[in-house]
């Protein structure tokens, strides 16, 4: 099997946590030919979509350290799978990349059409019965109205962020509300998502993982640091692995038809207090953490589901 990973920040990865390298290592150990390229390496030549790729090899059996070697130009139609691991926020080059991959029928995980059309913050609006009270707005008054309706605390997020970046927790009568609104919306120029604060977040944000339509039996619980409300590892949260609960399974059953409809092979869902807060399909993470603290190897589950075609 010949596979490629689209990764824009390969050299800056944290090998102890990175999911992309974890998946690539398993592919290499299975004898697959593993390549990598970034969004700027694409070209259309003589009716072919090509990329300047590097071969990815792992010299040590039990470590994720890797070697890169320039490989030259590859026709992307020759790859069995192309794994898109580009992190948000996205720019026009990312959009053009997805359009090219679609136009030339390159087999991508997850499908580029889904990545282009499904926003991770907005997609939860399809499941109103299982999400926190949520608004999408650029209006300061709409945020104030939520407080007037009885909410004591709100979380405000950009629509294109990741890793807890630029997320604000605001409280009723917060004197910083206006300046937070100015900062995150550009004085009303950009839409944001506003959600009721879930107090159970203090005990941890639950990341469940769905691969090939199946929920992993273990989840990652990310507990915020005492100095930060965000349950993101990139924001200093700590983590532990636990068995998924019946509530987790119910939420998975709610979103599975949506994932199948859009041919989404690999997804992560974030759950707070029994409610779905985000649905990550762009570049889901946390596989290494689950692998290291349980008897489940998610990278094996990932590649087993794709077979050896």
How would you describe each model-predicted region?
Residues 131-151:
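Rossmann-like NAD(P)H-binding beta-loop-alpha module
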Residues 11-12, 17-136:
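Conserved N-proximal alpha/beta basic substrate-recognition cap immediately N-terminal to
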Residues 87-89, 159-161, 284:
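Short glycine-rich anion-binding loops that position phosphate/pyrophosphate groups of nucleotides
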Residues 7, 12-16, 243-309:
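ATP-dependent carboxylate activation and anion-phosphoryl transfer catalytic cores
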Residues 1-4:
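Extreme N-terminal starter segment of soluble prokaryotic enzymes
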Residues 141, 150-152, 163-249, 259:
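Phosphate-binding site of ATP-dependent enzymes
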Residues 6, 84-86, 158:
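Short, well-ordered coil/turn residues at beta-beta hairpins
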């Amino acid at each position: 099997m010949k596979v490629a990973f689209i990764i824009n920040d390969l050299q800056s990865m944290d090998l102890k946590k990175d999911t992309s390298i974890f998946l690539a290592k398993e592919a290499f150990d299975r004898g697959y030919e593993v390549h990598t390229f970034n969004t700027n390496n694409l070209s259309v030549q003589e009716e072919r979509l090509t990329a300047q790729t590097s071969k990815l090899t792992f010299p040590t059996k039990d470590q994720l350290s890797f070697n890169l070697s320039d490989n030259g130009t590859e026709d992307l139609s020759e790859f069995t799978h192309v794994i898109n691991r580009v992190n948000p926020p996205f720019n026009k080059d990312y959009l053009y990349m997805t359009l090219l991959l679609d136009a030339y029928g390159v087999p991508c995980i997850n499908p580029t059409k889904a990545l282009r059309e499904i926003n991770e913050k907005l997609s939860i609006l399809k499941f109103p019965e299982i999400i926190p009270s949520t608004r999408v707005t650029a209006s300061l008054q709409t945020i104030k109205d939520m407080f007037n309706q009885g909410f004591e605390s709100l979380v405000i997020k950009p629509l294109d962020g990741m890793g807890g970046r630029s997320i604000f927790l605001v409280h009723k009568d917060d004197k910083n509300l206006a300046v937070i609104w100015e900062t995150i919306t550009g004085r009303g120029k950009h839409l944001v998502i506003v959600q009721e604060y879930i107090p159970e977040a203090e005990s941890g944000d639950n990341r469940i993982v769905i691969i090939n339509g199946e929920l992993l039996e273990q989840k990652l619980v990310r507990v915020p640091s005492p100095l930060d409300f965000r349950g993101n590892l990139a924001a200093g949260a700590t983590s532990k692995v636990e068995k998924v609960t019946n509530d987790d399974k119910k939420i998975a059953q709610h979103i599975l038809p949506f994932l199948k409809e859009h041919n989404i092979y690999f997804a992560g869902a974030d759950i707070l207090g029994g409610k779905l807060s985000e649905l990550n399909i762009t570049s889901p993470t946390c596989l290494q953490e689950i692998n290291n603290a349980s008897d489940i190897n998610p990278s094996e589950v990932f590649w087993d589901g794709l077979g050896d075609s």
